[in-house]
Protein backbone atom coordinates (compact mmCIF):
# COMPACT_ATOMS: atom_id res chain seq x y z
CA UNK A 1 0.00 0.00 0.00
CA UNK A 2 1.35 3.44 -0.88
CA UNK A 3 1.62 6.04 1.87
CA UNK A 4 -1.71 7.81 2.44
CA UNK A 5 -1.46 11.60 2.32
CA UNK A 6 -3.79 13.74 4.42
CA UNK A 7 -3.74 17.45 3.53
CA UNK A 8 -4.40 19.44 6.69
CA UNK A 9 -7.06 22.10 7.06
CA UNK A 10 -6.58 23.87 10.42
CA UNK A 11 -9.52 26.12 11.24
CA UNK A 12 -9.57 29.34 13.29
CA UNK A 13 -12.79 31.37 13.25
CA UNK A 14 -13.86 29.65 10.04
CA UNK A 15 -10.65 30.31 8.15
CA UNK A 16 -7.92 27.88 7.11
CA UNK A 17 -4.65 28.73 8.87
CA UNK A 18 -1.23 27.24 9.61
CA UNK A 19 0.56 27.71 12.93
CA UNK A 20 4.28 27.50 13.69
CA UNK A 21 4.93 24.84 16.36
CA UNK A 22 1.27 24.98 17.37
CA UNK A 23 1.57 28.43 18.94
CA UNK A 24 -1.63 30.46 19.12
CA UNK A 25 -1.16 33.74 17.29
CA UNK A 26 1.56 32.40 14.97
CA UNK A 27 -0.88 31.68 12.18
CA UNK A 28 -0.77 32.49 8.50
CA UNK A 29 -4.24 32.61 6.96
CA UNK A 30 -5.10 30.80 3.74
CA UNK A 31 -8.77 31.70 3.17
CA UNK A 32 -12.01 29.79 3.61
CA UNK A 33 -11.76 26.37 5.26
CA UNK A 34 -14.45 25.02 2.94
CA UNK A 35 -12.58 26.21 -0.15
CA UNK A 36 -9.29 24.79 1.15
CA UNK A 37 -10.80 21.35 1.79
CA UNK A 38 -12.59 21.26 -1.56
CA UNK A 39 -9.37 22.30 -3.27
CA UNK A 40 -7.45 19.36 -1.79
CA UNK A 41 -10.24 17.01 -2.80
CA UNK A 42 -10.10 18.38 -6.33
CA UNK A 43 -6.33 17.79 -6.37
CA UNK A 44 -6.76 14.10 -5.59
CA UNK A 45 -6.78 13.79 -1.80
CA UNK A 46 -8.42 10.64 -0.43
CA UNK A 47 -8.37 11.95 3.14
CA UNK A 48 -8.50 15.41 4.73
CA UNK A 49 -7.10 16.09 8.23
CA UNK A 50 -9.50 18.74 9.60
CA UNK A 51 -8.58 20.48 12.86
CA UNK A 52 -10.68 22.85 14.99
CA UNK A 53 -7.92 24.94 16.55
CA UNK A 54 -10.39 27.11 18.47
CA UNK A 55 -11.69 23.98 20.21
CA UNK A 56 -8.16 22.65 20.74
CA UNK A 57 -7.18 25.87 22.52
CA UNK A 58 -10.45 25.97 24.50
CA UNK A 59 -11.67 29.25 23.02
CA UNK A 60 -14.80 28.21 21.14
CA UNK A 61 -15.83 25.87 18.38
CA UNK A 62 -16.26 25.74 14.61
CA UNK A 63 -18.59 22.75 14.85
CA UNK A 64 -21.22 23.93 12.35
CA UNK A 65 -18.57 24.84 9.81
CA UNK A 66 -16.77 21.51 10.26
CA UNK A 67 -20.04 19.66 9.66
CA UNK A 68 -20.54 21.77 6.52
CA UNK A 69 -17.03 20.91 5.29
CA UNK A 70 -17.51 17.17 5.90
CA UNK A 71 -20.92 17.31 4.20
CA UNK A 72 -19.50 18.93 1.07
CA UNK A 73 -16.62 16.48 0.70
CA UNK A 74 -16.78 13.10 -1.02
CA UNK A 75 -13.53 11.95 0.62
CA UNK A 76 -12.79 10.68 4.12
CA UNK A 77 -12.21 13.16 6.93
CA UNK A 78 -10.14 12.77 10.09
CA UNK A 79 -11.41 15.34 12.61
CA UNK A 80 -9.32 16.70 15.46
CA UNK A 81 -9.38 19.42 18.09
CA UNK A 82 -11.00 19.66 21.51
CA UNK A 83 -12.53 16.17 21.61
CA UNK A 84 -12.37 15.58 25.36
CA UNK A 85 -15.70 14.18 26.57
CA UNK A 86 -18.81 12.31 25.45
CA UNK A 87 -20.51 15.49 24.23
CA UNK A 88 -17.64 16.72 22.06
CA UNK A 89 -17.01 13.18 20.76
CA UNK A 90 -20.66 12.73 19.79
CA UNK A 91 -20.69 16.14 18.08
CA UNK A 92 -17.53 15.28 16.14
CA UNK A 93 -18.84 11.90 14.98
CA UNK A 94 -22.18 13.50 14.08
CA UNK A 95 -20.43 15.56 11.39
CA UNK A 96 -20.10 12.35 9.39
CA UNK A 97 -16.30 12.22 9.61
CA UNK A 98 -14.65 8.83 9.17
CA UNK A 99 -12.67 9.09 12.40
CA UNK A 100 -11.70 11.46 15.17
CA UNK A 101 -8.40 12.18 16.86
CA UNK A 102 -8.37 12.31 20.64
CA UNK A 103 -5.37 14.10 22.11
CA UNK A 104 -5.40 15.75 25.53
CA UNK A 105 -8.14 13.48 26.90
CA UNK A 106 -5.97 10.42 26.32
CA UNK A 107 -3.50 11.96 28.77
CA UNK A 108 -5.83 13.63 31.28
CA UNK A 109 -8.73 11.18 31.30
CA UNK A 110 -7.33 7.73 30.52
CA UNK A 111 -10.42 5.84 31.76
CA UNK A 112 -12.69 7.78 29.41
CA UNK A 113 -10.25 7.29 26.56
CA UNK A 114 -10.09 3.53 27.17
CA UNK A 115 -13.89 3.38 27.09
CA UNK A 116 -14.28 5.27 23.81
CA UNK A 117 -11.52 3.19 22.20
CA UNK A 118 -13.52 0.12 23.21
CA UNK A 119 -16.84 1.54 22.02
CA UNK A 120 -15.79 3.17 18.75
CA UNK A 121 -12.82 1.10 17.58
CA UNK A 122 -11.47 2.26 14.25
CA UNK A 123 -13.34 5.58 14.49
CA UNK A 124 -11.00 6.80 17.23
CA UNK A 125 -7.31 7.55 16.74
CA UNK A 126 -5.07 9.01 19.44
CA UNK A 127 -2.78 11.93 18.74
CA UNK A 128 0.63 11.71 20.39
CA UNK A 129 2.22 15.17 20.43
CA UNK A 130 5.84 14.64 21.40
CA UNK A 131 8.49 17.04 22.64
CA UNK A 132 11.99 15.64 23.07
CA UNK A 133 13.63 17.28 26.10
CA UNK A 134 17.14 16.23 27.14
CA UNK A 135 16.67 12.93 25.36
CA UNK A 136 13.32 12.22 27.03
CA UNK A 137 10.19 11.83 24.93
CA UNK A 138 7.47 13.84 26.69
CA UNK A 139 3.86 14.14 25.59
CA UNK A 140 2.14 17.51 25.46
CA UNK A 141 -1.54 18.34 25.95
CA UNK A 142 -3.92 21.31 25.94
CA UNK A 143 -2.65 22.78 22.69
CA UNK A 144 0.88 21.69 23.70
CA UNK A 145 0.79 23.73 26.93
CA UNK A 146 0.88 20.89 29.51
CA UNK A 147 3.08 17.86 30.18
CA UNK A 148 1.33 14.55 29.55
CA UNK A 149 3.91 12.06 30.71
CA UNK A 150 6.39 9.72 29.07
CA UNK A 151 5.60 8.79 25.46
CA UNK A 152 6.61 5.15 25.76
CA UNK A 153 4.58 4.56 28.95
CA UNK A 154 1.45 6.13 27.47
CA UNK A 155 1.91 4.30 24.16
CA UNK A 156 2.15 0.98 25.99
CA UNK A 157 -1.07 1.73 27.91
CA UNK A 158 -3.03 2.82 24.84
CA UNK A 159 -1.75 -0.09 22.79
CA UNK A 160 -2.84 -2.56 25.48
CA UNK A 161 -6.30 -0.93 25.44
CA UNK A 162 -6.61 -1.60 21.72
CA UNK A 163 -6.10 1.87 20.25
CA UNK A 164 -6.60 1.44 16.50
CA UNK A 165 -4.27 4.18 15.22
CA UNK A 166 -1.74 6.74 16.42
CA UNK A 167 -1.09 10.18 14.93
CA UNK A 168 2.46 11.13 15.89
CA UNK A 169 3.73 14.71 15.89
CA UNK A 170 7.18 15.95 16.84
CA UNK A 171 5.98 19.37 17.95
CA UNK A 172 9.39 20.97 17.46
CA UNK A 173 8.92 20.23 13.76
CA UNK A 174 5.27 21.19 13.23
CA UNK A 175 4.75 24.11 10.87
CA UNK A 176 8.50 24.67 10.53
CA UNK A 177 9.22 22.86 7.23
CA UNK A 178 12.15 21.36 9.15
CA UNK A 179 11.79 17.76 7.99
CA UNK A 180 10.04 14.85 9.75
CA UNK A 181 11.48 12.98 12.74
CA UNK A 182 11.93 9.56 11.14
CA UNK A 183 13.49 8.01 14.25
CA UNK A 184 10.45 8.97 16.34
CA UNK A 185 8.04 7.55 13.75
CA UNK A 186 9.96 4.30 13.48
CA UNK A 187 10.24 4.03 17.26
CA UNK A 188 6.49 4.33 17.74
CA UNK A 189 5.68 2.03 14.81
CA UNK A 190 8.02 -0.65 16.15
CA UNK A 191 6.25 -0.65 19.52
CA UNK A 192 2.69 -1.13 18.27
CA UNK A 193 0.83 -3.16 15.67
CA UNK A 194 -1.58 -0.24 15.18
CA UNK A 195 -0.94 1.93 12.10
CA UNK A 196 0.90 5.21 12.62
CA UNK A 197 0.27 8.51 10.85
CA UNK A 198 3.14 10.99 10.65
CA UNK A 199 2.51 14.65 11.33
CA UNK A 200 4.77 17.67 11.31
CA UNK A 201 7.84 18.89 9.48
CA UNK A 202 7.23 17.71 5.91
CA UNK A 203 8.97 20.21 3.64
CA UNK A 204 9.77 18.39 0.41
CA UNK A 205 8.90 15.45 -1.79
CA UNK A 206 12.04 13.76 -0.47
CA UNK A 207 10.62 14.02 3.06
CA UNK A 208 7.51 12.18 1.89
CA UNK A 209 9.60 9.55 0.12
CA UNK A 210 11.56 9.07 3.36
CA UNK A 211 8.37 8.55 5.38
CA UNK A 212 7.14 6.16 2.69
CA UNK A 213 10.16 3.92 3.38
CA UNK A 214 8.59 3.24 6.80
CA UNK A 215 5.30 1.83 5.48
CA UNK A 216 6.54 -1.74 5.94
CA UNK A 217 7.14 -0.93 9.62
CA UNK A 218 3.60 0.33 10.14
CA UNK A 219 3.61 4.00 9.12
CA UNK A 220 0.38 4.26 7.15
CA UNK A 221 0.07 7.93 6.27
CA UNK A 222 1.42 11.46 6.52
CA UNK A 223 -0.38 14.69 7.29
CA UNK A 224 0.89 17.50 5.08
CA UNK A 225 0.16 21.12 5.86
CA UNK A 226 2.45 24.07 5.48
CA UNK A 227 4.48 22.61 2.60
CA UNK A 228 1.33 22.43 0.47
CA UNK A 229 0.10 25.89 1.45
CA UNK A 230 3.57 27.36 0.90
CA UNK A 231 3.60 25.67 -2.53
CA UNK A 232 6.78 23.69 -1.91
CA UNK A 233 5.05 21.08 -4.07
CA UNK A 234 1.55 20.31 -5.29
CA UNK A 235 -0.66 17.55 -3.97
CA UNK A 236 -0.58 15.67 -7.32
CA UNK A 237 3.23 15.79 -7.20
CA UNK A 238 3.18 14.47 -3.63
CA UNK A 239 0.78 11.65 -4.48
CA UNK A 240 2.96 10.65 -7.43
CA UNK A 241 6.12 10.75 -5.27
CA UNK A 242 4.81 8.24 -2.72
CA UNK A 243 3.46 5.95 -5.44
CA UNK A 244 6.79 5.69 -7.27
From Swiss-Prot:
Active site: 10, 129
Pathway(s) of this molecule: Amino-acid biosynthesis; L-histidine biosynthesis; L-histidine from 5-phospho-alpha-D-ribose 1-diphosphate: step 4/9; Amino-acid biosynthesis; L-tryptophan biosynthesis; L-tryptophan from chorismate: step 3/5
Alphabetized Pfam families for the sequence: His_biosynth
Main location: cytoplasm
Keywords: Amino-acid biosynthesis, Aromatic amino acid biosynthesis, Cytoplasm, Histidine biosynthesis, Isomerase, Tryptophan biosynthesis
Catalytic reaction annotation: 1-(5-phospho-beta-D-ribosyl)-5-[(5-phospho-beta-D-ribosylamino)methylideneamino]imidazole-4-carboxamide = 5-[(5-phospho-1-deoxy-D-ribulos-1-ylimino)methylamino]-1-(5-phospho-beta-D-ribosyl)imidazole-4-carboxamide; N-(5-phospho-beta-D-ribosyl)anthranilate = 1-(2-carboxyphenylamino)-1-deoxy-D-ribulose 5-phosphate
Main EC class the enzyme belongs to: isomerase
Keyword Amino-acid biosynthesis: yes
Biological process according to GO: L-histidine biosynthetic process; L-tryptophan biosynthetic process
Gene Ontology MF terms: 1-(5-phosphoribosyl)-5-[(5-phosphoribosylamino)methylideneamino]imidazole-4-carboxamide isomerase activity; phosphoribosylanthranilate isomerase activity
InterPro entries (alphabetical): Aldolase_TIM, His_biosynth, HisA/PriA_Actinobacteria, Isoase_HisA-like, Isoase_HisA-like_bact, RibuloseP-bd_barrel
Gene Ontology cellular component list: cytoplasm
E.C. no: 5.3.1.16, 5.3.1.24
Family, similarity comment: Belongs to the HisA/HisF family.
HAMAP family, A to Z: HisA (MF_01014)
Primary role: Involved in both the histidine and tryptophan biosynthetic pathways.
Protein name: Phosphoribosyl isomerase A
Organism: Mycobacterium tuberculosis (strain ATCC 25618 / H37Rv)
Upper classification of the organism: Bacteria, Bacillati, Actinomycetota, Actinomycetes, Mycobacteriales
Gene name in the database record: priA
